[in-house]
Structures are given as C-alpha cells and as structure tokens.
Amino acid sequence: MESVSDSTAEVSATMDCDGNTEAFEKVKSKKREKCKRAAAEMDTQTEESSSSAPVKRPHFPALSGDQLGGGVDEMRKVPVPSHRYTPLKENWLKIFTPIVENLQLQVRFNLKTRQVEIKTCKETQDIGALTRAADFVKAFVLGFQVEDALALIRLDELFLETFDVTDVKPLKGDHLSRAIGRIAGKGGKTKFTIENVTKTRIVLADTKIHILGSFQNIKMARTAICNLILGSPPSKVYGNLRAVATRSAERF
C-alpha cells in the first residue's frame, strides 16, 4: 500500500511540474528588440533615399565688387613727389588707361594735395583691383618704367620692396657714395646684370633701393646688393648669382 501511495505522489508531482512549465512564458531581451527596430528603420531610410531624387546643392551667384564693399566706394591716395610731376604728366595716358579700362576704376590727379586718387565704382568687378592699381601707381612714382610697373596689374605674384643702403651698413660720406657706385657699376652694368639674372627690376634713388619682382627673385637680388654694400667685389657677386641661377634652373 505504501508503494502505491508513493507512486501516486510522484505522478502528481510530475503533473505539477508540467503544469508549472506551461504556466511560465519566455521573456525576450529588450536589447535585441531595439537592435531589430533600428535595423528596420535604417532599411526604410535607405530605401526612401534611394527612391527619392538626389538633393541639389544650393547655387549662389558671385557678388560684384560693389556688393562686396557694401555699396560704399573705397579710395586709395598715392602721394607724388615734386621730381615725378613731369614724368607723371608725360605718361598719364599710359597710366590711367589700364586702370580705367582693365580694372574699371576711377582715377584722377588732385592738384591741391599732389596725390593720385583711385576710387572704386559700380562697374568695378574685382575687389582686389584697387590695391593692384595703387601698387602700379606707387611703382611708377618710385621710378620704375610704366611697362615694368604694368606687371603689377597683370600678375598677382609680384611685390615691391624698398630698403636703404644705411640699413645694411651705416656708411657716410665717400664710403656711402662708393657703395652706391658698386651697386650701379660702370654704366649701370652691375645693376643690369643683377636684374637679368634674378629677373627683377631695380631702381637706385639716392640711398634708397627699390626692387620689383617675385618673392624668391627679390630675395636673390637683395642678397647680391647687400654683399656689394658690405664690400664684396662684383666678380664674386657675379659668381654667386650664376650659381644660384643654375640651381634655380635645375629645380624648375
């Protein structure tokens, strides 16, 4: 009898266990559900983007010089020394023609203030034209030929550099005159040689030296002139210039 009761208890226990297993529900992890939702959203977005037409970039028309300046006309004034009045008067047609026709600027010579005044107008297209025109007039006032100064309008990589002989070495009297004579050379030979090798233009105005050219070429010409001021013989300077010229030719 005891064995029969034990077997019935075991059967009821197994029945209870089976009932309990059916009562429990499996809970899915929330992380997996989130990942599945995110993947489904990404798929729908890619389908929508592929089906829709490609987005066009916004097109903004270029502003004119008048609009960039805010409608206010800008002006540059270049003072003219007394010894350059006559050359300015003789070459005035060559000076104002490229400024007015090519750069679309207004220019005049103020007789009261003795200055060349350059001004923008509604026809001005390039905002940097005013600076280039001022550099062009300044180069002519310093003593450069109109044809050489015109390169400042045509080319962007040209610069003007000015320094004094006494900035290199504090010379006075005859020593200063001899230094200037060494830079010029007999009949201007040394100056022309430096100009041709370095592809620059040099103006000697009393103790002032003005160089027109690209940054690298100005550096070469300035080094040669400084060596002459410090007392190097012209033959040595010529040799150094040739070496530098051959090096630069090999690079390019």
UniProtKB/Swiss-Prot annotation:
PANTHER family: RIBONUCLEASE Y (PTHR12826), RNA-BINDING PROTEIN PNO1 (PTHR12826:SF13)
Basic residues bias (residue ranges): 28-37
UniProt family annotation: Belongs to the PNO1 family.
The protein, known as: RNA-binding protein PNO1
Role description: Part of the small subunit (SSU) processome, first precursor of the small eukaryotic ribosomal subunit. During the assembly of the SSU processome in the nucleolus, many ribosome biogenesis factors, an RNA chaperone and ribosomal proteins associate with the nascent pre-rRNA and work in concert to generate RNA folding, modifications, rearrangements and cleavage as well as targeted degradation of pre-ribosomal RNA by the RNA exosome. Positively regulates dimethylation of two adjacent adenosines in the loop of a conserved hairpin near the 3'-end of 18S rRNA.
Keywords per UniProt: Nucleus, RNA-binding
Statement: the UniProt record of this protein carries the keyword Signal: no
Compositional bias segments (type: Polar residues): 1-11
Subunit structure: Part of the small subunit (SSU) processome, composed of more than 70 proteins and the RNA chaperone small nucleolar RNA (snoRNA) U3.
GO biological process: ribosomal small subunit biogenesis
Pfam families listed in its UniProt record: KH_PNO1_2nd
Residue span of region Disordered: 1-72
InterPro entries (alphabetical): KH-I_PNO1_first (IPR055212), KH_dom (IPR004087), KH_dom_type_1_sf (IPR036612), KH_PNO1_2nd (IPR055211)
Taxonomic lineage: Eukaryota, Metazoa, Chordata, Craniata, Vertebrata
Natural source organism: Danio rerio (Zebrafish)
Limits of the KH domain: 168-225
Positions of transmembrane segments: none
Localization in the cell: Nucleus, Nucleolus
GO CC terms of this entry: nucleolus; nucleus; small-subunit processome
A single GO molecular function term of this UniProt record: RNA binding
Nucleus among keywords: yes
